[in-house]
Amino acid sequence: MEQALKQAKIAFDKNEVPVGAVVVDRLHQKIIASTHNNTEEKNNALYHAEIIAINEACNLISSKNLNDYDIYVTLEPCAMCAAAIAHSRLKRLFYGASDSKHGVVESNLRYFNSSACFHRPEIYSGILAEDSGLLMKEFFKRIRTVISSHRMT
């Protein structure tokens, strides 16, 4: 999770929503993908950290199934990312801060408990949640400050 948090800080510095994700090979305890949100730079709403990490991992192992892999994410996944986690069959999901607005693991929809979900990873939440949450709060505080200063001019 520390590596995911490092990625989130990189996103923060790039004015991206500070979410980081890593995919780990469970058997060898090795990170095979380490990324962060990149929606602003790519001008593409699909470039969430989880989607990029899953894509990189699948390309690396030449398989769409990540049964022997775990994903660590600094923020509770949204609907798109939760579906990608299910479709790629990741074994375990570890995430940091809850997302009361868009999170669908435990905060809202509870996607992995729905009949629409055909694969449910083991779920572990609250890992480095305070660090992840503070980074998100600082990011959106900065955004609000920029918006306020533009309104004044």
From Swiss-Prot:
Annotated positions binding Zn(2+): 48, 78, 81
Pfam family, one: MafB19-deam
Entry superkingdom: Bacteria
Co-factor: note: Binds 1 zinc ion per subunit.
BP terms from Gene Ontology: tRNA wobble adenosine to inosine editing
Catalytic residues in the record: 50 (proton donor)
Record-annotated CMP/dCMP-type deaminase domain positions: 1-116
SUPFAM superfamilies linked: Cytidine deaminase-like (SSF53927)
Catalytic reactions on record: adenosine(34) in tRNA + H2O + H(+) = inosine(34) in tRNA + NH4(+)
MF term (GO), any: tRNA-specific adenosine-34 deaminase activity
EC numbers, comma separated: 3.5.4.33
Subunit and interaction comment: Homodimer.
Purpose of the protein: Catalyzes the deamination of adenosine to inosine at the wobble position 34 of tRNA(Arg2).
Identification of the protein by name: tRNA-specific adenosine deaminase
Originating organism: Rickettsia conorii (strain ATCC VR-613 / Malish 7)
Gene transcribed to yield this protein: tadA
